[in-house]
Amino acid sequence: MAIQFVINLLVSVIWLLVTNSYTLNNFVLGFILGLFLVYLLHRVLPGQFYLVRIYRIIMLIITFLTELIKANFGVLKIILKPRIENKPGFFVYETELERDWQLVLLSNLITLTPGTVVLGISDDRKKIYIHSIDFSTKEEEIQNIKSSLEKVVRKVGEK
């Protein structure tokens, strides 16, 4: 991925030198030409096309921000109710992530989401212990995490 970006920048700089025009517009045009060239050569270059990984990271950020906003409103709803009706609880989330950095990223995203805290990870790195401030059902909580956060974390790690 890094070599593809370096080649793209190199093509941009060469474009600036060949055209003898050192403007931002010309650099952007050279960058787009370099992007096209790297895309044509990405089967020969190591790794996947680097814009795919950048797109997946952007989707991870958007998904996390969406979950963050939904969780904030959920916690706000709990706080503003005159009666305490939430049912906090602990549950075990079994993950299919294989790499340590993916597991840590998922755990951090869960903890950063209001209303949930990761308490620990099992020794076999297949289970995450989570506390939720409003525990409706285990299946619903697990499906929520699996369909949103774990899905995009897994995609970022794919090659």
UniProtKB/Swiss-Prot annotation:
GO terms for molecular function: antiporter activity; monoatomic cation transmembrane transporter activity. Disulfide bonds: none annotated. It is found in: Cell membrane. The chain crosses the membrane at residues 1-21, 27-47, 60-80, 101-121. GO terms for cellular component: plasma membrane. Keywords: Antiport, Cell membrane, Hydrogen ion transport, Ion transport, Membrane, Sodium, Sodium transport, Transmembrane, Transmembrane helix, Transport. It comes from the Bacteria. GO terms for biological process: proton transmembrane transport; sodium ion transport. Belongs to the CPA3 antiporters (TC 2.A.63) subunit E family. May form a heterooligomeric complex that consists of seven subunits: mnhA1, mnhB1, mnhC1, mnhD1, mnhE1, mnhF1 and mnhG1. Mnh complex is a Na(+)/H(+) antiporter involved in Na(+) excretion. This is Na(+)/H(+) antiporter subunit E1.
